[in-house]
Each structure stands twice: as C-alpha cells, then as structure tokens.
Amino acid sequence: MTTIVSVRRHGKVVMAGDGQVSLGNTVMKGNAKKVRRLYHGEVIAGFAGATADAFTLFERFEAQLEKHQGHLVRAAVELAKDWRTDRSLSRLEAMLAVANKDASLIITGNGDVVEPEDGLIAMGSGGAFAQAAARALLLKTDLSAREIAETSLHIAGDICVFTNHNITIEEQDLVG
C-alpha cells in the first residue's frame, strides 16, 4: 500500500506521499509518484491502494472537476455518487485525498466524502502512524505544514514496512 499525509497550516496546504509499490510482501517499485496536481494545478491529489484503480479514480475525479469548474467539494460528492452506483467503480480498491485552497477531503473506497475538522489527512498502510506523528507536531510545535507532512511520513516509513522514505511533496498557498 502506501502512506499519504496532508496538512493545512500557516497559509499552506501540503500533501505528501511515499513512493513504494508492493505486490504482496515484495517491493516492486520505490519511486512511484502518488501525489500529483489536477485541474490546472489548483488541486492536489494523492492515492492509497491499488495503483490501476487509483488512476481510474484520478481520471474520473478530474472529469468531475472540469464539469464543475474546479469546485472541489462538488466534484468529490459527484465522484462519490458515481462510486456508489457504478458497479465497475464500486470494485475499485483505492482511496483519494484531495485538497485545494478551500478544503481537504478524503474520498473513501465505499464512496464516502470526509472533510477532517483539523485539516489533517493521513491514510494508507502507514496512515495511523503518520496521523499520530502529525497530530503531535501540530499540537506541540510551530513547524510548517511541509515540515510536519515530511516528518510524519518519515516516522511512518520507519514503522510501516509498506511505506518508504522516497517522498513526493506538493504545496499550495491557501490564499489567492
């Protein structure tokens, strides 16, 4: 699997993901890019789960973003509706984290859309480790969103065998 972390702090939203692709208990690739920009660079998206399924979801989500002129929440809700009603989509084994200047959302494998109240997203095999680390750093330090995302992913990578230290980071200003 993988680990994705997104943090909102000090006027920035940051999303970071590790690069490990595993097949069972075997590492197949260590430098996959699981965090990318969508919709003219205005949206950051990351995935955890089956890679081919995630690419299908990226395509569907980007189509919804285009259809709804980049409105993140509306596009996520419409994707979730499709996910629940389309039999081929309902079999996909992936989760998306999406963020822009207005919101950070998790789109789950059963078609739920969740906006965390604290602006922190951590998902995937190392998600619980990354979330605990990020939450502690948010509460007890003044580190930037980027530093928190990167540090929490490194901690998850030290603990979770399905998460490595080859990190991709995307950052966006919350204003403008």
Curated annotation (Swiss-Prot):
Subunit structure: A double ring-shaped homohexamer of HslV is capped on each side by a ring-shaped HslU homohexamer. The assembly of the HslU/HslV complex is dependent on binding of ATP.
Enzyme class: hydrolase
MF GO annotations: metal ion binding; threonine-type endopeptidase activity
Keywords, ordered alphabetically: Allosteric enzyme, Cytoplasm, Hydrolase, Metal-binding, Protease, Sodium, Stress response, Threonine protease
Record-listed E.C. numbers: 3.4.25.2
Protein function: Protease subunit of a proteasome-like degradation complex believed to be a general protein degrading machinery.
InterPro entries (UniProt xref): ATP-dep_Prtase_HsIV_su (IPR022281), Ntn_hydrolases_N (IPR029055), Proteasome_sua/b (IPR001353), Proteasome_suB-type (IPR023333)
One Pfam entry name: Proteasome
Family statement: Belongs to the peptidase T1B family. HslV subfamily.
Disulphide bond pairs: none
Matches recorded under Gene3D superfamilies: Glutamine Phosphoribosylpyrophosphate, subunit 1, domain 1
Main location: cytoplasm
Activity regulation (UniProt): Allosterically activated by HslU binding.
The keyword Cytoplasm is annotated on this UniProt entry: yes
Binding positions (Na(+)): 157, 160, 163
The protein's name in its UniProt record: ATP-dependent protease subunit HslV
A GO CC annotation given for this chain: HslUV protease complex
Reaction catalyzed: ATP-dependent cleavage of peptide bonds with broad specificity
GO biological process assignments: proteolysis involved in protein catabolic process
Highest classification ranks of the organism: Bacteria, Pseudomonadati, Pseudomonadota, Gammaproteobacteria, Pseudomonadales
